[in-house]
Amino acid sequence: MVATKKTKKSTDNINNKLQLVMKSGKYTLGYKTVLRTLRNSKSKLVIIANNCPPLRKSEIEYYAMLAKVTVHHFHGNNVDLGTACGKYFRVCCLSIIDPGDSDIIKTTPGEQ
């Protein structure tokens, strides 16, 4: 029960940091643009929803490994990630180019 509260709090923390990035930073939404930013070495952090198709997920992780970029696996599905970004559509993956006022890159635990 305590672990559930901690997960909920960390999810809220990531959601708040994502909202701050959406207001003050630069980002791209979507699979094709995430791959483009990874190939051009512009991305600083990639966030992937947990229901992203496995082939897409592995391809994004491969390009992120080549570009030495941290990948964070979001604990919600693509609808939850879209809502956390403040959008009214589904977001499977997003790339943060400039975090702006947010410290999401320093505090987000990433898996590569």
Swiss-Prot record:
Q: Which UniProt keywords apply?
A: Ribonucleoprotein, Ribosomal protein
Which HAMAP family does the record match to this protein? Ribosomal_eL30 (MF_00481)
GO CC aspect terms: cytosolic large ribosomal subunit
Gene behind this protein = RPL30
PROSITE patterns in alphabetical order: RIBOSOMAL_L30E_1 (PS00709), RIBOSOMAL_L30E_2 (PS00993)
Q: Tell me what this protein is called.
A: Large ribosomal subunit protein eL30
Please give the InterPro entries that the UniProt record associates with this protein: Ribosomal_eL30, Ribosomal_eL30-like, Ribosomal_eL30-like_sf, Ribosomal_eL30_CS, Ribosomal_eL8/eL30/eS12/Gad45
One Pfam family per UniProt? Ribosomal_L7Ae
Which molecular function terms from Gene Ontology are attached?
A: RNA binding; structural constituent of ribosome
User: Which SUPFAM superfamilies does the annotation name?
Assistant: L30e-like
Kindly indicate whether the keyword ATP-binding belongs to this entry. Answer: no
Give the family from UniProt.
Belongs to the eukaryotic ribosomal protein eL30 family.
